[in-house]
Amino acid sequence: MKNTIAPTCLVLIIACLSCCACTQSGTAGLHLNGTWQLVTGMTITGKDTVPYAGDFRMIKIINDTHFAFLRHDKNPPKDSSNHFDAGGGIYTLSGNQYTEHLDYYSDRNWEGKPFTFTVEVRGDTLIQTGIEKVDAAHIDHIIIEKYVMVR
């Protein structure tokens, strides 16, 4: 009986470590932490593709558990149409599936909703593709954004 306890414990320890290694290896290749500046973005609704990012600056800040984004007009008008946009919350990352759980946003229709993206990092470039669907705001489109790491 004593001879089977040690091998059994060893097998259980190896199994536990293997599970942990599998969980971490799925995201080991992706390094999202940092400050990212939006370079290009587009939305696709049906057959309509609308590029954006030319008239404003946007950054996304990601740490181990949270994300935030900040956006403002490049050339702000002198009247009340000056626009600033911000949001943030927690995120999860499983393999290349990045899900933002939007806890704070200037348009409350978006709050409390998860948005899942497929992410890819190439050097200092982050590309995220996903679907934004917010019934209350009449939003249902594919979104593709390309960011570059701010140094």
Q: Residue spans of the language-model regions?
A:
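Bacterial Sec-dependent N-terminal signal peptides
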Residues: 1-31
